[in-house]
Structures are given as structure tokens and as C-alpha cells.
Swiss-Prot record:
Belongs to the aspartate/ornithine carbamoyltransferase superfamily. OTCase family. GO terms for biological process: arginine biosynthetic process via ornithine; citrulline biosynthetic process; L-arginine biosynthetic process. This is Ornithine carbamoyltransferase. HAMAP family: OTCase (MF_01109). Keywords: Amino-acid biosynthesis, Arginine biosynthesis, Cytoplasm, Transferase. It comes from the Bacteria. SUPFAM superfamilies: Aspartate/ornithine carbamoyltransferase.
Amino acid sequence: MTAKTIRHYLQFTDFSLEDYEYVLERTGILKRKFKNYETYHPLHDRTLAMIFEKSSTRTRLSFEAGIFQLGGHAVFMSTRDTQLGRGEPVEDSAQVISRMVDIIMIRTFEQEVIKRFADNSRVPVINGLTNEYHPCQVLADIFTYYEHRGPIAGKTVAWVGDANNMLYTWIEAAQILGFKLRLSTPPGYALDMKLVSPDSAPFYEVFEDPNEACKGADLVTTDVWTSMGFEAENEARMQAFADWCVDEEMMGHANPDALFMHCLPAHRGEEVTAGVIDGPQSVVWDEAENRLHVQKALMEFLLLGRLKH
């Protein structure tokens, strides 16, 4: 593989609408193969390096199982027990690791770190999560919506809660896929406009009242109030976010057939009530499973390009 052919997936804007249409189609195909116990090994003998600076359940399991199901295998690497955690330059680690594997997934804190790694990698790099963006999760959410309701283009998504990596990724997705995002965050926790492209302005609207943000929504989504790395702010956040709990009353402002999503782990009684996340509008378990399927399609696409079957 030459440098000219390498594609990375570091944030949602790395793919075009046409790329997403293809990847979502492939996701459905790969999920059907999985459900039918059909052996499919297009990535036979390929190796995925998984580098974790942030702990994970869903990210590790979905990538490790996914590459295995495609015929490859995974190597787990933690910064706690590699030279990355002992001060080796990111650029040097990227040069070495990318000469020994076929594709790399990184889950870390700063987006700048994964960008520097990708700039020095000889193989595709996937963002498994950073403080700024979480593209694999939003891609899974969009596929989940597609499964249950059809294309998301022209629909309305409501975000209630923190201005975190999920929200910034949803804003990018709205611009590329053509849906409307209505968002509400507490005072003092507004968007960091350095992470928002001016071109995305027509695709999102900010509301002070979370109930107002949910009006007419086809999908309501949220996340934890205190993300990893912000634990010191937890007490202050519990007070600031108290009115941003997605409950049955808030869901009542959305369309009657609106879905509810949460990327998990969830804290019932904080960002969402048990009645909502465990209720009939919730699709969080399908959403969690779909991380597996979209990431399989993503790895297949980055390594093999567009397939004709």
C-alpha cells in the first residue's frame, strides 16, 4: 500500500456522502452475514493494532470481534505497558507500529495525538474515540436509525446534554448527510466554536430549553454528563445538568415515533430516566451491537476499497 492510497477515519468529515452510502450499505450486508452465521473472511491474515489510552468495553470488544469475524486478528496495546506511555514520540511509535500491522485503531484523549499518529502511519488509522470526536459511534447511531426508520436525510435529531465529542460529531454528520440537529446544553457548557465549522451553521440550531430542542424530533439522543477526563467537575455538572435529563415528559415533545439513543454506559436517573432508556422508544441495545457491524464495514472499506459484491 502506498502513501497515496491510504485513507484514515479520524473524524466524520473524512468521508463523503457517497462513501457513507456505500459503508452503510455494506454494514447491512455484513450484519446479515453475521446473523446467518455465514463465514466471510475478506481480511484473512490482516492484523489490527488497537491502542488504548482511555479504557473501553464496547470499543475494544467490537473491534476485536469484528476483525476476527472478517478473518483477521487483533493486537491489544495499552499506553500503560508500551513505549507510548513512557515518552516515545507519537511519530516514532506510528512509524514502527504501522510497519507491523495492516490497520490501527486508537482510543485516546487529544485529537491532535491521533492526527500526528496518522500523519506518520503507513496504514489506515481509525479514531476509536478522542475528546473532540467519536465518529464510529455516530456512524453506528445513523445505521441504527436507518434500520428502524430509513434514511436520516431530512430528519430532525435532538441532542440534550453536554457539548462533547458525540455532539461535535453529530454536527459534522448533519452537514454531510443532510439532516437537522436541534441541540440544548446547560449554561456554561456551550459549544466550543473552534470545533465547529462555519459551513455547518445551517444544519444545527441551539436552544436554551431542552424540551424545545426535542420538539418535532425523529431521534432524541444524549450522553453522560461527565465524560472521561472531567471527573473533577462531576459535582458541579450534576447541579448544572439537572434539567437536562431525558425523561418521559421530554420525549413527549418529540414525534410520537421518535427513537431514543445513548452511546452507553448510561447513568439512569442522571442524563436519562429508566423509563426512557428501558422503554419502547429506546434502541440502545441495537445501537451498541451496531458498533460491531459498522466498524467491520469501515475496516473492509479502508483496506479493500469499494467491493462489487
